Amino acid sequence: MMKMEFGKELLVYMTFLVVVTPVFVQAIKKTELIPSKWLPTVSILVGAILGALATSLDGSGSLATMIWAGALAGAGGTGLFEQFTNRAKKYGKDDK
């Protein structure tokens, strides 16, 4: 396995995970199996799992690094998703 160039590849993987993790969490949310209050935690866990799975890709970091990156991406993805949905709720209909 190649050694990861810490800033470059990690940023690429985290960017991908920030986009993909909310998609998985939204799918989980639609099942209504998990209460909404737990979705941010689920997002972090999903990100960590996806990060762990990404260790099989070329140029990825160690398992610990990728789990850490995935968990951070999951947390960031949730924050980004919430920011846009709350903004849409607040400004969506009033701006027209």
Curated annotation (Swiss-Prot):
It is found in: Host cell inner membrane. Coiled coil: none annotated. It is a multi-pass membrane protein. Keywords: Cytolysis, Host cell inner membrane, Host cell lysis by virus, Host cell membrane, Host membrane, Membrane, Transmembrane, Transmembrane helix, Viral release from host cell. InterPro entries: Phage_A118_holin/antiholin. The chain crosses the membrane at residues 33-55, 61-81. GO terms for cellular component: host cell plasma membrane; membrane. Its main location: host cell. Residues 1-32, 82-96 are cytoplasmic. The keyword Ribosomal protein does not apply. Residues 56-60 are periplasmic. One of its GO terms (biological process) is killing of cells of another organism. It holds the Pfam family Phage_holin_5_1. It comes from the Viruses. Isoform Holin has 3 transmembrane regions whereas isoform Antiholin lacks the first transmembrane region. Isoform Antiholin: Counteracts the aggregation of the holin molecules and thus of pore formation. This is Antiholin. It comes from Listeria phage A500.
